[in-house]
Amino acid sequence: MTDEAQPPLSLFIVAAEESGDALGAALVRALKARHGHALTLHGVGGRAMAAEGIASPFAIGGLSIMGVVAIPGRLPMIFRRIRQTADAVVAAHPDALVIIDSPDFTHRVARRVRQLAPTIPILDYVSPSVWAWRPGRARAMRAYIDQVLAILPFEPAMYDKLGGPPCRYVGHPLIERIAELRPNAEEAQRRREDPPVVLILPGSRNSEIRHLLGRFGAAIAQVAARSGPLELVLPTVPHLAAQVREAAAGWTIPPRVVVDPAEKWAAFRRARAALAASGTVTLELALAGIPTVAAYRMSPVEAFIILRLVRLLARLPSVILANLVLGENVIPEFLQSACTPDRLAAALLPLLSDTPQRRRQVEAFGRLDAIMAIGGEAPSDKAAAIVGEVAQQRGRHGPAALGRRRAFG
C-alpha cells in the first residue's frame, strides 16, 4: 500500500530505560520502512528514540525501578512521571500505545491510560517475567494489554497457560546482532589457541560488581593455577570502569577492562569460555557459542524475597535465561551461598578444554537458531507488522468498536 492510499497512523511509544529506548528506536525504523510518511509518532524515550524523531517530554534517567529495597526516595518522581506520561498519551489519542519493557513503570502508565481512554489499543513489547514470579500478573494484564510482543520463544505458551492476553513471539533483539556475536574463521581459530581468552562479566550495576567481582577473581586464580596462562577480558560500562579496574588490579592475572562495545563483541568472537553474572548476557554468550558458568549474589533482603518467589511461585528449573530458552540446565548456575570461588573454579576449568562439559554446552547452543527462529524476518520488522496491524484495525473499525470488543471479550 502506498503512502497516499494508506491512512496516516498515530502511535505513542513509551520506554523507561536505555535497553527499551534502543528497542523503541529499532521499532520506529521498521515502522518508517513500512509506512513511510503516513506515520505520526509521539513518545517517551531516550537518545536513541530522539534520533528517530521522537521528542520525549522529559529525560528517562532514574525511571528504572530496580531492586526491592533501594528506591523509596525516587518514588514521588516516578509516580509523577507515570501520570505525566499517561496524560500525554490521552492528549495525543494515538491509534495505538506501545509500552516497552520496564513493567513497574510502563504497566502503571498502561493501566492509567486504559482508565482514562479505554478505546486506545495497548501493546506490550517485551513481556514481564510472569513465568519467573508473580504469574498472576498475566491474567491481570488482560484488563489493560491487548497484545504482548514476546522476545522469548516459550512466552506465548506461558501466557496461554496462565490466562493472559494474546501473545506473539517476534524474536529477541539479539537476533539482529548475531553477526557481531559469532566468529569468522580467523576468530574461531583464536578460540582454539593458547592462552585461552576468558570473558569475565560481573554485571552492570554497582551491587553486582560489589558482590561478584572478588569471587570471580578468586575463582580465576584457582583456574590459572591449574590450567596455565589465561587472557582475561572484562567488558563493563563507562561509569563503572574505574571501580572495576581498581577492584581487579590485585588479581593474579589482571583482566583487560573494555568499555567500547566493538571491543566487547570482538572479545566474544575470540573467547573460549566465560564467567558471567546471571542475566541477558547468558543468552548473548549462548548465541555466541561460548561455554559459560553463571553466578549471582544480591543483598540478603533481596535474596530472601526474589529467590523464594522465583522458585516457589513458578517452580522454575533454572534462573539462567539461556537455560530457560533451551529447556534444559546446560549452563551451571551458582546462586547466593553456592557462589563460591571453589565451585566457580571447578565448573569453569573443564570448559577450557575438550571435555564432556564443554561439548554439552556447545551442542546445546547449536540448537538455538531453530528454537529462536534465527535467519528469518528481523524481530523489529515482526513487531512493526503487528503494531501496524493493531493500529490499522482501530482505524478501520473505529475506537468505539474496539472498546465494545474489549468490554465483552
Residue ranges and their predicted role:
Residues 1-409:
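Nucleotide-activated sugar donor-binding and catalytic core shared by glycosyltransferases
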